[in-house]
A protein has these predicted regions:
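Hydrophobic anchor at the beta1->P-loop junction of P-loop NTPases
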Residues: 9
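NTP-dependent small-molecule kinase module
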Residues: 114, 130, 134-138, 152-183
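ATP-dependent small-molecule kinase phosphotransfer cores
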Residues: 37-96, 103
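Walker A/P-loop
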Residues: 18
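ATP-binding Walker
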Residues: 15
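Conserved phosphate-donor/acceptor-positioning beta-strand/loop module used by diverse small-molecule
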Residues: 97-101, 110-134
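P-loop (Walker A) phosphate-binding loop of NTP-binding proteins
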Residues: 12
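Post-Walker A helix-loop "phosphate-sensing" segment adjacent to the P-loop in P-loop NTPases
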Residues: 26-34
Length: 183
C-alpha cells in the first residue's frame, strides 16, 4: 500500500516557514497538519487554521491523554502535533506537511523514519533579526531571546535531510516542491 509523504519544516522564528507552507498549500495536493500551542495568536491568525490555540491546562490534558505525536516547549510556550488526521491522511496516500520546531522534528523522525525533514535557514542572523523587528509583534527583549534560540537551532540544522536558505521566497518554495516530488 502506498503512503503519503510526511514533510516536516523547521527553522527559526521569522525565517518564513509559514509563508512557504501557505505557498505549498496553494501549489500541491497536500494536507497541512495544524499544530497546537499555548502561545497567543498573532494578528490575523485564526484558531483551527494557523494553530489550535489552547490553555496550558488543556495542552497538558492532551499530553496526558496521549493525543499528541510530539510536543516541546519553545520560548515559554508549548507546541505540539495532534495525532489525529496525520496517519489517516498518510494511509490514504495523501502527503502531510507540518511546521514543527527542532526538538519536535527529532521526535517525529524517531516515530516516522521515512519523514522528510527540511530546515529553513535565514540568509544571516542579522537578516533574521531585521525580519523579526519588521513583524512588529515583539519587544526587543523577546526578539533577542528568539535570536538566541535561532543560533542554537542553526547549530543542529545539519541533522536535517535538507537545508534551504530562504533569501528568496519563490526559490525556497520551489526547492521544497522539488524535494517533495523527487523523494
Amino acid at each position: 500500500m502506498n503512503k503519503g509523504k510526511f514533510i516536516v519544516l523547521s527553522g527559526p522564528s521569522g525565517v518564513g516557514k509559514g509563508t512557504i507552507v501557505a505557498n505549498l498549500l496553494a501549489s500541491l495536493p497536500i494536507h497541512y497538519s495544524i499544530s497546537m500551542t499555548t502561545r497567543s495568536p498573532r494578528e490575523g491568525e485564526r484558531n483551527g487554521v494557523n494553530y489550535y490555540f489552547v490553555t496550558k491546562d488543556e495542552f497538558e490534558k492532551q499530553i496526558k491523554q496521549g493525543n499528541l505525536l510530539e510536543y516541546a516547549t519553545y520560548n515559554n510556550n508549548y507546541y505540539g502535533t495532534p495525532k489525529d488526521k496525520i496517519e489517516e491522511k498518510l494511509n490514504e496516500n495523501i502527503s502531510v506537511i507540518s511546521e514543527i520546531e527542532v526538538k519536535g522534528a527529532k521526535q517525529i523522525k524517531k516515530i516516522y523514519p521515512e519523514a522528510i525533514l527540511i530546515f529553513i535557514a535565514p540568509p544571516s542572523v542579522e537578516e533574521l533579526k531585521n525580519r523579526l523587528i519588521g513583524r512588529g509583534t515583539e519587544t526587543i527583549d523577546q526578539i533577542n531571546e528568539r535570536i538566541s534560540i535561532a543560533e542554537e537551532e542553526l547549530k543542529v540544522a545539519t541533522l536535517y535531510d535538507y537545508i534551504i536558505v530562504n533569501d528568496y521566497l519563490k526559490y525556497a518554495t520551489d526547492k521544497v516542491i522539488n524535494i517533495k516530488k523527487n523523494s
